[in-house]
Each structure stands twice: as structure tokens, then as C-alpha cells.
Amino acid sequence: MRIGYQANAWGGVVGHPVGVTSIKDLFYLTPGDTDDTLGRIAAAGYEGVELFDGNLVELADGALEAHGLALAGVYSGANFVFPDVLPEELWRIRRAAELGQRFGAEHLVVGGGAQRTEPATLEDYERLGKALDEVASIAEEHGLTPTYHPHLSTIVEGPDQLEQVFARTRIGFCPDLGHLAAAGGDPVELMRRYADRIPYIHYKDVTEEVAFVPLGQGTVDFAGVTGALRDAAYDGWIVVELDGYDGDPDAAARDNLSYVRGLLG
């Protein structure tokens, strides 16, 4: 298994400001100096990095190679359930896939499925499933492996909602252990249940108060998850993510790498 890091540890995430008036330009973006962040991830000892689509828009040719990093994945997302804007959203995801291909990414990860003011309907899940199939096709056209990332504050947070969407789409599964645990899921059980759909994973820890913390400081059973991955002969990327953390991101990145290496033995 290879170990990467999500660049949002240094700056979090915002939507690109142009997207306020142009859905097709509503890229995710970690503010700040992406090249500096790449240097910090490399200095911590990681092999790869995951970047938001908006950071790839700004990335200079050769930046990854200069730091000795592989692009494990590019992360994008959309509402997916509003038919009138879906073509604009898919245009943006196609752009993310093009950028991912250009910079040598292996995976296209998408989150989303908008929460309405009313509970999600079966039609919402049908629309989400069909849109994710289109995302999968876009990714594959560009040589990327497509996965869906459940996330708090979307219509797919926990186990019951996972069943709803995965019954309606062929896209792969990128589990985010912190988000799944925060939504009431058992990450170990979910790894075993969906083992044949998982080509990529986010290692993220969370407290009972839903604060994201360095690995091993929260509620996630990482030893159990890693055992489930081994049982499934998983040999892909483990991407560590730690956003919204008040501590030193550089020290946390080093500690997280040591923690994962300890799990892998």
C-alpha cells in the first residue's frame, strides 16, 4: 500500500469565487501556496498527494515531480440532484478529469448529493446514481479510477444512505473513515461489506464531538480497518486527511505517517 496526504491540512477548503455566478467554475480549492504545501507533504515523508480540482487549475507543470510526489487523486464534487445545472457540473468534473490526466492522477474522487430543506427522496438517489455513472464514464475516458466519497452534510452520510446510492450506480467507493464514523457507521463493517468496491480510501479520525484529529486520537478502529483491507488484498493508496485541525499541521502530518506505517508493519 502507498501512503498519501490531502493538501487541505494547510488551508482547508473553499469554493472558487468565480463559481458564485458560474456553476461550471465552482471548483473546490485549498487557499494558499500549493507549491509550498507540496513541499511540506514531501518533507513529512509521503509518496503522494490528493489535490482539489481548483488547485490543479493553478498547478504549474513539473510541480509534483519537483517534490518527488505522485498525484494519488483529484477531488471534485457537485450537487448532482438538480437536473437544470447537472450539465454545468459534469462539464466541471470533465475539466477535473482532464487536469488529473495531465498531471498523472490515478483516481478521480467526487463527493456531493445536495441536501435539500426537506428529506432526500428516492428520486434524489436515482438522480445521484445516474449522475455518478456519468462521472464514472468521464473518469474512465481519461484513464482515472472513479470513486464516490460520502460526506457529512450531503444526502449520503451513513450506512443506510450508502445502500441507497450504491444500489443505483456502478461507481467505486472511497470510504472516508472519519465521516462514516461521525454519521454513525462502523468503518470496519463497511470496509468488509463493500470490499469489492474500494480502490481508494481516506484515513481520517474523528472524536465523539465530531472534531477531526490526528490518527489514533479519535474513535476510528484503524487496526480493524487495516485488517479488513489486508483480508481483501487491498493494494492501493491510503490517503490521510486532517482538515479543520487547530494544531501544527506539519507535526500532525509526520505523526500521521508514523501511525499508518505502524499499522502496516
Predicted ranges, named:
Residues 34-38, 57-62, 93-98, 129-136, ...:
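Generic structural signal for well-ordered alpha-helices
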Residues 48-60, 79-89, 116-120, 152-157, ...:
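Acidic-and-aromatic substrate-binding clefts and catalytic sites of carbohydrate-active enzymes
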Residues 3-7, 49-51, 71-76, 108-110, ...:
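Hydrophobic faces of well-ordered beta-strands that scaffold small-molecule active sites
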Residues 10-12, 77-82, 114-117, 204-210:
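Conserved radical SAM core fold
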Residues 43-44, 102-103, 196, 232:
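Structural motif
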Residues 17-31, 86, 163, 179-235, ...:
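Gly/Pro-rich active-site loop or hairpin
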Residues 1-101, 140, 144, 257-265:
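N-terminal pre-domain/capping segments
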Residues 66, 81-173, 182, 250:
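Active-site acidic/histidine proton-transfer and metal-coordination neighborhood
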